[in-house]
Every structure is written in structure tokens, then in C-alpha cells.
Amino acid sequence: MQTSQKHHSAAGLHMLYPQVYCSPQFQAKDNKGFSDIPSKENFFTLESSTASGSLPSYDSPSVSITSGRSPFSPQGSQSCISDLHHSPDNVYGSPLSGVSSLAYDEAGVKSKIRELEVSLLSGDTKVEEFSGFSPAAGKSWNWDELLALTPQLDLKEVLVEAARAVADGDFATAYGFLDVLEQMVSVSGSPIQRLGTYMAEGLRARLEGSGSNIYKSLKCNEPTGRELMSYMSVLYEICPYWKFAYTTANVEILEAIAGETRVHIIDFQIAQGSQYMFLIQELAKRPGGPPLLRVTGVDDSQSTYARGGGLSLVGERLATLAQSCGVPFEFHDAIMSGCKVQREHLGLEPGFAVVVNFPYVLHHMPDESVSVENHRDRLLHLIKSLSPKLVTLVEQESNTNTSPFLSRFVETLDYYTAMFESIDAARPRDDKQRISAEQHCVARDIVNMIACEESERVERHEVLGKWRVRMMMAGFTGWPVSTSAAFAASEMLKAYDKNYKLGGHEGALYLFWKRRPMATCSVWKPNPN
């Protein structure tokens, strides 16, 4: 444990210092929800959608998310959805009944998740968009002819046809399409050409049964820690995805701990600890003095490699800042994967108000479809047993956990097309740093989702509708994201491309690229029952 009474040098540590935005004052949550969000050009709601389910225009004057600020309960609505991928126009709204029971039931969780999965995949319009093309009746593919036509082919169609052949076990056709794809993709091309490079690599790895080997190779052939940190910094600066997580969670945490004198934050993806630099500075301004702040950070191997050392570096950096700000500070490390965490690893002490932060990490926890241990739900029940004041959950809005291979491939194609477009808006296509950042920080995840299965597939995203089921079954009640957090996120987005937007639905805050939801922030409290 480090305390702020010991002076530690923070030189040469984390490069990803967060420029986190907040409202001028952090006030206790009122009963207005998102009733008055500044910067309305950056904000729209899902509630104002038409009956057909299409999203409203981005300059919609309506910014109301909830009619009341009180917590919404499972009984408040029979809809547990947040899937915005139900049609090409992001139609949302897929009823899921019977989620009112909060008593944990493993079979019940599986049943509700399966029910939602069926609802999401029924009439899978994303796959149906690619109706397929085929050679003339009774003829086989003429690959030489197809290669000659590559300038006229739609790259997305070719990618999906290759994936369809893989799914059907038609290896000859799959390899034929991969040869065509080699002539169409480029790491320095358009967003779809760059993405196509990595998706084709994933397909080839799956065909050759070397998915896990290639995934491990990508991990083993990483650049040096300093280089990787540099590439991570590039993505951090040109895309708002991590700042969205840090900004919204920090505002929610500050509001939740107002008036507390002893605060314990447990972060399951603390990475470089950047989020808490801002938090410490804000706590130092608290009227009447700051609380004693205790932070438990859970580690992962990638963060250890990137920062060039263990969690002690994070603790030293935060302790140094806390001391300079006059904030009493303690740091506890849990050097292990999140799925291995037990209660005794968290450094709990009596008398602390506990807050738990899950930033883009729960999707790495294996669930009931992977392991009988079901660490995803086990961890949520562990957190519930701590009686936290607040749990913040930020995740990618994508459905790749249990969907069949072809549906998963098309979902990955859709999601990462938007991500690569958003990166493209910030850096030139021939920018070497951008190319390296995509190769070393994004490609590995894509290959893992396409090439690997069972326990070796660690990228298992779920849409908020599924997280809602899991949180409710674990004994949590959803709580609307505050006006202050929405304001802070809106202010943060002013530094980015105008195609980034905010939206809200059932109390959660969504980050969009154009019409595609990319990430969600939701807030949870233990059910009093």
C-alpha cells in the first residue's frame, strides 16, 4: 500500500493523461434527469424516435431522457432492450418479459440471455443485407475472371461471402475469396480497406485452424512497451471512446461520494490510472476538505507491458499527485485478471463508501457459454455483496458474445467499419502512427473475434440489453446517468469530429459515430431488497 505521505517520482510514467471534462460544479443528483443539456447539437434521444424505430435527426431539440430522476426498476418496463442493431436503420425495441426477479438463478440468467439473443438474431437484417452473389447456374466460380473485376466489386460483399463460405465449410470457395480480397485490401487505404485487411487475416487464421496461434503471435510480436504506449496514446487522443468512459464515470463517482469522508474506489481496468488524476484534483477542491481516498486497481498483462512495470507505478504516480493536492490517499493493487478476483483481493476495510468502476472490461470475463464458473456473473454477485454506493459500467455496444459465426462476423464488420471511419476522420490515411496504432491496438481484437472460439475467444461484447439482464439478476437497479455527466461528455465531444453524437435510452448514455452506437455508460446501485 502506498500513501500520499511518501513522495514518489511520477516522471516518465503514463503518457495518456486524460483531458477530462466536467460541469463547473458537481451537484447532488436532482429529479430532472437530462432535462437541460448544453451543447444540444451534440445530443439526441432515442425516445424521440418515430414509431418505425428510426433514430431522430442529430439536431433534434429534444434532450429529455427520463421523466423523473428516481431509479428505474425492473418492474418499470417490460422491455429490457438496448439493442440498436435490430435493423439497418438501428431500430431499437425488442421486448423481453419477466425480468422482474432479482434473486440470482443461474438457469434464469441463461434463459433470459438466450431469450434476448433469439430476439436480436431473429430476422438478422445485418446478414440479410448481404444476400450473396453466385456464379451462373450450374457453373463454378471463375476466380481469374473475378480477380479481373476487383475494382468493381463491393469489398463488404466479398468479405461476407468469404465468411459465408467459411461458415458453410466450403473451404475452396473461402480460399478463392481470400485471394480476391488480397487484391482489394490495404493498411493505408480507405477505412473498409484497412478493416478488410484484418478481417481477411482472421478468416485465413480460422480456415487454417491457427486462430489462437496467430492471436498469440500478435501478442508476442508486439512493439516495445514504449512504442505500444505511443500507439495507445495516438488512439486515446484521436478517438473519444476512453475519454467518454473516464469522463462520465468520474462525474458519477464524484456525485455519489459527495459528503463521504472515507471512499474506496475499485477499478477493474485501471490501466495507467489516468482517470484518477482528474478525480484527485476535483476532490482537493471539496468544501470542508477532501475525503480519505483508497483506490484498488486490478491489473492486466497488456497494461503491465505498456507501462513498463507493475501497478506500483500507478500507485506511486497517484500518491505523488494526491500528496501535492493535499488528498489523503492509499493504493491497493490486485495483480491478476479480473476473472480471478475474490473478495480477499480487494483490500476492503470497514467504514469506507465503496464505488466500483468497470470501464470496457466485463466483456473479457468468460460467461456461462464458456465456463461453468461463469466469471462474468460471479464477479457481479461479488460486487453486489460489497454493498457499493455505485457501480459504473461502460462497454462497447456490440453483440459478439454468443451469436453464430456469420452473424458475429457481420456485426464485427459493422461495428469496426464505424470505428475505422472515426479514426479516418482524425488522421491521414498514410499516417504511420495511425497505421501502427490500428495494427497493434485494434487488429488483435478483430482477429480474436473471427478466428478463435471457446475459451480462446476473449473478445465477447454484449449490448446493453444483455448487461441489463445480468445486472438485474445480480441484484442491481439501474440509475439514470446524471445531467452533469451528460454535460461533461457533451463538452468533451466538442474537441472531436461532428459525427460523434450522444444519445440516451432507459437512463443510459450512448456514444454514437454517425448513426451507429459505439459505447454505452450505465449506472447501477444495489437493489434495496
Swiss-Prot record:
Induction: By osmotic and cold stresses, and UV-A/B. Residues 313-345 are annotated as: Leucine repeat II (LRII). InterPro entries: TF_GRAS. It comes from the Eukaryota. Expressed in roots, hypocotyls, cotyledons, shoot apex, leaves, flowers and siliques. GO terms for molecular function: DNA-binding transcription factor activity; sequence-specific DNA binding. The keyword Lipid metabolism does not apply. Residues 51-81 have a biased composition (Polar residues). Residues 153-213 are annotated as: Leucine repeat I (LRI). The keyword Heme does not apply. It is found in: Cytoplasm; Nucleus. Residues 146-525 form the GRAS domain. Residues 451-525 are annotated as: SAW. One of its GO terms (cellular component) is nucleus. A motif (VHIID) lies at residues 263-267. Its main location: cytoplasm. Residues 354-448 are annotated as: PFYRE. Pfam families: GRAS (PF03514). Residues 51-84 are annotated as: Disordered. GO terms for biological process: regulation of DNA-templated transcription. Residues 232-297 are annotated as: VHIID. Keywords: Cytoplasm, Nucleus, Transcription, Transcription regulation. Belongs to the GRAS family. Probable transcription factor that acts as a positive regulator of continuous red light signals downstream of phytochrome B (phyB). Required for the regulation of hypocotyl elongation during de-etiolation. May be required to modulate phytochrome A (phyA) signal transduction in a phyB-independent way. This is Scarecrow-like protein 13. The gene is SCL13.
